Structure formats: structure tokens, C-alpha cells
């Protein structure tokens, strides 16, 4: 008997998931996609299985703008375990070295200012970065270590929240591409005792905060009670991640031409940069870029939601 193909729903929007411990970002995405029965889905940058917290999941038309969330600043709280280093710089790796911990709160407070601002980081071997088409973590699992070029990242916030024994909790605000495992490992070396990430929780992704998230258990409960459609109430608008962008409103006439690929003028447009665009009904219709002549050129358009 032939298997009946599941017809997926054409839904658009963003679900802010509090990613559970032990899930890869893709596993979490596919689970929510199944619950929602969504036709198209994507996430906005990976969180390690060890990590929990804010993971924006994009569906339908919202996937067109996931790159802009990927490029946004992030916030984390992490527990730094001092006295040991591991192969993965987190609790899941093999212990490589154990050292005595003779430092306390005052020592950590004295060290962390040097890691604020623009710093250079060498990406860890256990990362998704690729060398000759191969993810570094696959090379690492095969016992290979390759040279990695240091990359510039920005640490806008680095604060010590608490310190007890050999563990310290840190709050971090950083630019895209920052590896918290590398940051913690580097702080550990600066302290002279080594360190790794024992816990990691993302508290912010762009404009989204932890308080806005929904748990997988809540989504499963809603699905059990009302099916796929019951999850629609958790969907945020497709432009939710762009709320910090300048907003331009187009007249019905201008919106028609803009949606057909033509650059148009708008009285409330800024002098330059990227903008999110709404039509005369206040409906989000895409993003544009203000050109030198003041016209708004369409960059990504959205179908009617």
C-alpha cells in the first residue's frame, strides 16, 4: 500500500523557541516544523546541544530574512568551570589538563576587562567552520588539528554575576561569530588555571529576549490539544526580527511598482541604509535599500501573508 504524502501547510512567521538541553538546533527546528506541519522552515544560527535558550525558528516567508537575525548581536549567560581544560572547551569533551584553582572573584574581575571590546579569537576545532569543504568538528573527531586564522569579534558586555568555589557565572553580550567556549577558555588561561564552559544559555538574539520564548513542552501540549493550527498563535510576524530597522510606508501606487521590482521614492525614507517596507494598509511587503539618489530599491519581497 502506497504511503500517503503529508501535505504541509503554507505558514509564515517566527517562533521563538527556548531550545532544550541536548537538542541540536536542526533537531529542534525539525521537531517544531513537524508540530506546525510547516512547508518551509529554517533557523538563525546554531546553538550547541549543550546550550539552551533563545533560538528563533523561521517559517515560510520569514526564512527570507533569517540571515539578518544570524548577523545580529547575541547575549549569553555561561557557567565557567575553572581548573580544567577539555578537548571541546565544554563539559562534553575529554579532560586534557587539570590545574589547581587559586583565584577568586577579585582575580576574575581584574582579568575580564581585557576581553571587552574588539578582540581576536581563534575558532575552536570543534566548530561548524569548514576547511576545504569539511566541517572542523569532523576533522577534530578524526584526530586532526588544522591552523585557524584569528577573527575579530566584539564583546560589548562581559560581567561576573557570581563566583563560588571553582565555578563562575558570566553575562556576555557579543557580536555574531563569537565563540563563548573560546572566550571562557581564554579567560581561564589568563587566570592561569584553565577553564571550560559547564553551562551555556542564550538570553538574547537580536531584538528577541528569553522572556519571549516558548518551550518545546508548551508547543507539544498545544499540538496535543488542538493540532497543527493550535501552534499558529505562537507565530510572530515575519518582520519581527527587523523591528530596529527604519520603517518606510509606501502609497498604494508606489507599493505596486516597488513589488514589481522598481525603485521608488518615499517622503519618510532615511538618507541611506536598509529599511523595512509596509504598504498603505500597514502590511509588511519586504526590505529595501536606499540608494544614493534617495529612491528605495527592493532587496527581498514578501508574498501576501
From Swiss-Prot:
| Keywords attached to this entry | Isomerase, tRNA processing
The record, for InterPro entries, names: PsdUridine_synth_cat_dom_sf (IPR020103), PsdUridine_synth_N (IPR002501), PUA-like_sf (IPR015947), PUA_sf (IPR036974), tRNA_psdUridine_synth_TruB (IPR014780), tRNA_sdUridine_synth_fam1_C (IPR015240), TruB_C (IPR032819)
Instruction: From the UniProt record, give one GO term of the biological process aspect.
Output: mRNA pseudouridine synthesis
SUPFAM superfamilies the UniProt entry points to: Pseudouridine synthase, PUA domain-like
Q: Where are the transmembrane segments?
A: none
Report which reactions are catalysed by this protein: uridine(55) in tRNA = pseudouridine(55) in tRNA
CDD domains annotated for this entry?
A: PseudoU_synth_EcTruB (cd02573), PUA_TruB_bacterial (cd21152)
Q: What biological function has been recorded for the protein in this entry?
A: Responsible for synthesis of pseudouridine from uracil-55 in the psi GC loop of transfer RNAs.
UniProt protein name? tRNA pseudouridine synthase B
Q: Which organism is it from?
A: Pseudomonas entomophila (strain L48)
Gene name in the database record: truB
Amino acid at each position: 500500500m502506497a504511503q500517503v504524502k503529508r501535505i504541509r501547510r503554507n505558514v509564515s512567521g517566527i517562533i521563538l523557541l527556548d531550545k532544550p538541553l541536548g537538542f541540536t538546533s536542526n533537531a529542534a527546528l525539525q521537531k517544531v516544523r513537524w508540530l506546525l506541519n510547516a512547508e518551509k522552515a529554517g533557523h538563525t544560527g546554531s546553538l550547541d546541544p549543550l546550550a539552551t535558550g533563545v533560538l528563533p525558528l523561521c517559517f515560510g516567508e520569514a526564512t527570507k530574512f533569517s540571515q539578518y537575525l544570524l548577523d545580529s548581536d547575541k547575549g549569553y549567560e555561561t557557567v565557567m568551570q575553572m581548573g580544567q581544560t577539555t578537548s571541546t572547551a565544554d563539559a562534553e569533551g575529554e579532560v586534557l589538563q587539570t590545574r589547581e584553582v587559586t583565584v577568586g572573584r577579585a582575580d576574575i574581575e581584574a582579568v575580564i576587562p581585557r576581553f571587552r571590546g574588539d578582540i581576536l579569537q581563534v575558532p575552536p576545532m570543534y566548530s561548524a567552520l569548514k576547511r576545504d569543504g569539511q566541517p572542523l568538528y569532523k576533522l577534530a573527531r578524526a584526530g586532526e588539528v588544522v591552523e585557524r586564522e584569528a577573527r575579530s569579534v566584539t564583546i560589548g558586555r562581559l560581567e561576573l554575576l557570581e563566583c563560588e568555589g571553582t565555578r563562575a557565572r558570566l553575562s556576555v553580550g557579543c557580536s555574531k561569530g563569537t565563540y563563548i567556549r573560546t572566550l571562557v577558555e581564554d579567560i581561564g588561561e589568563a587566570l592561569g588555571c584553565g577553564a571550560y564552559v559547564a553551562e551555556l544559555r542564550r538570553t538574547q538574539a537580536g531584538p528577541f529576549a528569553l522572556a519571549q520564548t516558548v518551550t518545546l513542552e508548551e508547543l507539544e501540549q498545544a499540538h496535543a490539544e488542538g493540532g497543527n493550527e493550535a501552534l499558529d498563535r505562537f507565530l510572530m510576524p515575519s518582520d519581527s526580527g527587523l523591528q530596529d530597522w527604519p520603517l518606510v510606508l509606501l502609497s498604494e501606487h508606489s507599493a505596486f511598482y516597488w513589488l514589481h521590482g522598481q525603485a521608488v521614492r518615499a517622503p519618510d525614507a532615511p538618507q541611506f541604509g536598509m529599511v523595512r517596507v509596509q504598504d498603505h494598509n500597514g502590511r509588511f511587503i519586504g526590505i529595501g535599500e536606499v540608494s544614493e539618489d534617495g529612491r528605495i530599491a527592493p532587496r527581498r519581497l514578501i508574498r501576501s501573508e
